[in-house]
Amino acid sequence: RLTAKPLKFTCTGPHMLTKVLTDRFYGDRAKLAMAIAEVLRDQLSNIDASVVQIDEANISGHPEDQEWALAAINHVLEGVKGTRAVHICFGNYGGQSVQKGFWKNLMPFLNELKVNHLVLEFARRGYDELDAFKELNPSIGLGLGVVDIKDNLIESPDTIAKRLETAEKTLGPGRVPFIHPDCGFWMLQRSVADGKMRALVAGRDLYEGRK
């Protein structure tokens, strides 16, 4: 065992995989997505982790795919034993966002996900779009991105605490049960990633002390 702490397992989702694969068999993206979803569901049903997270970095720029993406993602989630999470961001290539879009365009999709909580990008984009999440299904926890993974600057604990305060003022107490980086740290040096995680913890503690 690598840790005594609760384990989160992450997996690229069926929409993202469908958008980047060449289809030489199905001739239909919805059918391809569901075939991928069936394989992922079978594999993830055997994962003994506290949280299983599906990563989708393409749907943010393609709300027109919501119907078939939702069916495929939910099919995967139905096979998860532990807590179900879905991460959505706007992509990252060389420190730049890949997708263009707005969270409000995804609200019907987000509200129909069979998920316990969302893991969303905010730090890079800012928090002006938080108002849209007043319409989020109250049974779905909102995970707030408070660390920008496309910038080498390490946030101060005070900056992170203020981001949490903004979210609570906008959405109300208890609507943001999770905080996290916007996405993965693979583009950053280890020292920067470690510094950002330390700042995240310190910012959370500072925010909790102010409440």
Describe the residue ranges of each PLM region.
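Domain-level signal for soluble alpha/beta catalytic cores
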Residues: 1-211
